[in-house]
A protein has these predicted regions:
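Ligand-binding clefts/hinges and TM-proximal coupling segments of bilobed small-molecule sensing domains
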Residues: 32-33, 169-189, 227-229, 261-299
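Extracytoplasmic small-molecule ligand-binding "clamshell" domains
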Residues: 32-116, 266
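Extended ligand-binding regions for polar small-molecule ligands
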Residues: 33, 39, 74-82, 155, ...
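Bilobed "Venus flytrap"/periplasmic-binding protein-like clamshell domains
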Residues: 49, 55-58, 68-85, 121, ...
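Periplasmic-binding protein-like
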Residues: 54, 137-145, 213, 221-260, ...
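Acidic, polar ligand-binding/catalytic clefts
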Residues: 77, 88-156, 296-298
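Short beta-strand-to-loop elements that line the ligand-binding cleft
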Residues: 87-100, 184-193, 233
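A ligand-binding cleft/hinge motif common to bilobed small-molecule-binding domains
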Residues: 103, 117-129, 173-181, 200-203, ...
Length: 299
């Protein structure tokens, strides 16, 4: 445990008791005195700021009505409900701010967003800057290409161009394979976001686009050229997704994980999952089912 968290321990314990009394209808006066960090920020501003992606289907994207929607957004809505209950503020304002792979971590660290609800992998390196909720999805790196490439694995793109999002776990995986010598003469093309990656493959500007396979399935589902596209190859990485938040804020993390645990415990996660993944033909895997059960912590 870090020094900051150690100093906060008495207040964290107090907040745990305060949370229960708030939910039971006790007066809010003493509760406000115990708040700190993100909960205090939200309480004082009467606003929770949600960071969302613009084209990370089916997790977090902007629909035809310019509304942020998706699997991660539905889970974050449950978290917002929990925050409202804890703070006894049912009229809490929710503000949405678009983020991208390049600015999502700085936006969280700089208090521009309180929760990043997208498709962000929880890594040990990122935990040096931010914190994550319990895992709500697991995926891994694979390859999107045109069927005409007749590729089976990423090694089939030796001597060709491969698009990657700068700073992503997928980029690191490809570059590690290049360093190891299993990928040779590949030309790396930096891609801004998922939408650009799809467009680059559709327009033959790159031979392949490498990112999380579940995102690739979502991109194909929305493509006008879906019959010509395919996801190929083995999983190159293991990528557990989490809701991103600021570090050293155990009280807020507890509220976030309590909300997710309730969704897992009640079985509501099955309905939410089916809503977003059944349409793209991705059933709930045994690994994900076990993950939800393991994280369905009792109150």
């Amino acid at each position: 445990m870090d020094k900051i968290a150690t100093r906060r321990l008495p207040k964290i314990a107090a907040l745990g008791m305060t949370t229960m009394t708030l939910l039971l209808g006790a007066g809010p006066g003493s509760a406000a005195d115990d708040l700190y960090g993100t909960l205090k920020k939200i309480n004082d501003s009467n606003t929770v700021i949600i960071g969302h992606r613009e084209a990370s289907s089916p997790f977090s994207y902007v629909d035809d009505h310019k509304k942020p929607v998706g699997y991660a957004m539905d889970l974050c809505a449950k978290i917002v409900d929990e925050i409202k209950a804890v703070l006894k503020k049912p009229g809490l304002t929710v503000t949405y701010v678009a983020v991208n792979p390049q600015n999502r971590i700085p936006m969280v660290m700089n208090h521009a967003v309180d929760l990043e609800c997208g498709s962000t992998t929880n890594t040990l390196g990122r935990q040096k800057q931010v914190e994550f909720s319990s895992v709500y999805f697991t995926t891994g790196t694979r390859v999107l290409a045109r069927k005409s490439q007749k590729a089976a694995e990423i090694e089939d793109f030796n001597g060709k161009s491969v698009g990657v999002i700068a700073g992503s776990t997928n980029e690191r995986a490809v570059k590690a394979m290049m360093t190891a010598g299993s990928l040779k003469d590949i030309r790396i093309v930096e891609i801004k976001d998922y939408a650009e990656g799809l467009s680059a493959v559709e327009g033959n500007r790159v031979d392949a686009f490498v990112t999380d396979d579940i995102v690739l399935f979502g991109l194909i589902a929305k493509s006008s050229q879906k019959a010509d596209l395919v996801v190929v190859g083995r999983l190159l990485t293991y990528d557990p997704y989490g809701i991103m938040m600021r570090r050293d804020d155990s009280a807020f993390r507890l509220v976030v994980n309590a909300a997710l645990a309730a969704v897992y415990r009640s079985g509501e996660i099955n309905r939410i999952y089916a809503k977003w993944f059944d349409p793209i033909g991705v059933p709930l895997s045994p690994i994900m089912k076990a993950g939800f059960e393991l994280q369905a912590l009792p109150e």
